Amino acid sequence: KKILILGIMLCYVNISDARPISWSGGSTLMYKTNFMTTSYYYHYSPTYKYSLGIEYVDDKYFKEDYLNLRATYLINRKNTKKSQRNLYVTGGISSESINNFNYGIHGDWETRRIFASFAYINKHKKIKNYTENEFQLGIAPYVGEYNDLHAWIMLKTKKDTINNNWEIYPFIKLFKGDVLIEIGTKNSHWDVHYMFRF
């Protein structure tokens, strides 16, 4: 029911994407859930170069919940007539302890038809340190105009050093105006990402 409501919302909002930094002075709300964690994240971008935010995390794997203070910085952006490339560094510190923190790098490249991205995140926790690797590749079945509903058919592959194996699964990305939703499933677990910019 929640997914249906989010999908309907997409049709009524005035293209944006899942980049971790908004326009200068912009804010973003994000919701993510998968088999390991659920998180609610708000960030503000004083400029297009960086964002600062706070995140509530429900860690299902380690059975704990906490807040993260997070920051993301745009290292490099390259625009051409047909594509855009972005590279970011990110980091955060937990409300539990200064010894609970994370840092990483992620980037993306896209045309109006093709999307590719990667992420590497190192997470330090009192219980166990681990890393997460992720790659995404997608294609748009059609090229929409500015105010259209845009769709991407995607493949995601992920590996963390807890489970220590690569998992590949499909998902769909939809966005219109300032709203984005990604929905996928693996091993009967939903992988959902919802984003709203304002």
Segments (PLM) and residue ranges:
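Short, glycine/acidic-rich beta->alpha junctions
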Residues: N164
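Cleavable N-terminal export/targeting peptides
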Residues: K1-I21
